[in-house]
Amino acid sequence: MPERTELSLKELYIGNAAVSRGLYEAGCSLISSYPGTPSTEITALETAFGASLAGVRSCCAMKHVGLNVAADPLFTLSYTGVNGGIVICVADDPGMHSSQNEQDSRHYAIAAKVPMLEPSDSAEAKAFAKAAFQLSEEYDTPVILRMCTRISHSQGIIELEDRV
């Protein structure tokens, strides 16, 4: 990696990339998602949970309808607790820009009794991804990071920091 200068400490990132940068800086060692059949979001969340039980910071990413599929392990995680922090990144789609419904994942956070963070721009997306691990480990619970279409695809300035 080239040496950073004062000018390169800030860069333009879309929201999704900012989350990725935040996960990296926070020391996330495993990211799982739903790559296609025959695996499912259930498998992805259970993989992240297994890593968490081993003390590894992990993340699972899915879109909002995938959270329906992963509801069983989500509710189990909420009462079994975690060892390494676990962040569940969920992409909601208000206005149905690229999905089949307008489901609101905030209802899952309430029902499962897990904290949810909802960034409003790229800088918050990065910061909240990092903060989610701290909350997860401090309170022994998974944390949902709710992204929506507009925040995921809009660009903003983020400050680059070193990995922990």
Regions found by a protein language model. Name each.
Residues 1-2, 162:
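Iron-sulfur (Fe-S) cluster-binding modules
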Residues 3-13:
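Active-site mouth loops of central-metabolism enzymes
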Residues 11-42:
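N-terminal glycine-rich anion-binding loops that anchor highly charged ligand groups
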Residues 14-15, 33-36, 69, 118, ...:
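Generic structural "secondary-structure junction" signal
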Residues 40-103, 107-137, 148:
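Thiamine diphosphate
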Residues 138-164:
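Conformationally flexible catalytic loops at phosphate/diphosphate-handling active centers
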